[in-house]
């Protein structure tokens, strides 16, 4: 198992030149067309980074109501349009999403408002 981990680490750390050499060896000596595999290995890390940077929708998660629970319940009621009973239940059952799939600017504004009211909030 340790050998496979070492191999995987070496494979991930290959330079572009080394990946191309590996592709040539696989094609010439073993008849394997590694084009798709080479793209996956070379582009795998970059794709994950780009995806994180391009996130456009966020979930606003209430992790804890904080010290001023009443103010947080009122604000959640106002922000979500829920009734008082439902807003209180949402706050009591934290961590819970307050809003899901909102734009970054709106998510940050909601987070700021909730934190101002004393709540602990995170964006996902």
Swiss-Prot record:
Q: Which GO terms describe its biological process?
A: translation
Q: Which Gene3D superfamilies match?
A: 3.30.1390.10, Single helix bin
Subunit description: Homodimer. Part of the ribosomal stalk of the 50S ribosomal subunit. Forms a multimeric L10(L12)X complex, where L10 forms an elongated spine to which 2 to 4 L12 dimers bind in a sequential fashion. Binds GTP-bound translation factors.
What organism is recorded for this protein? Christiangramia forsetii (strain DSM 17595 / CGMCC 1.15422 / KT0803) (Gramella forsetii)
- Kindly list the organism's lineage: Bacteria, Pseudomonadati, Bacteroidota, Flavobacteriia, Flavobacteriales
Q: Name one GO cellular component term.
A: cytosolic large ribosomal subunit
Q: What is this protein called?
A: Large ribosomal subunit protein bL12
* HAMAP family (alphabetical): Ribosomal_bL12
InterPro entries per the record? Ribosomal_bL12 (IPR000206), Ribosomal_bL12_C (IPR013823), Ribosomal_bL12_C/ClpS-like (IPR014719), Ribosomal_bL12_oligo (IPR008932), Ribosomal_bL12_oligo_N_sf (IPR036235)
- Molecular function GO terms recorded: mRNA binding; structural constituent of ribosome
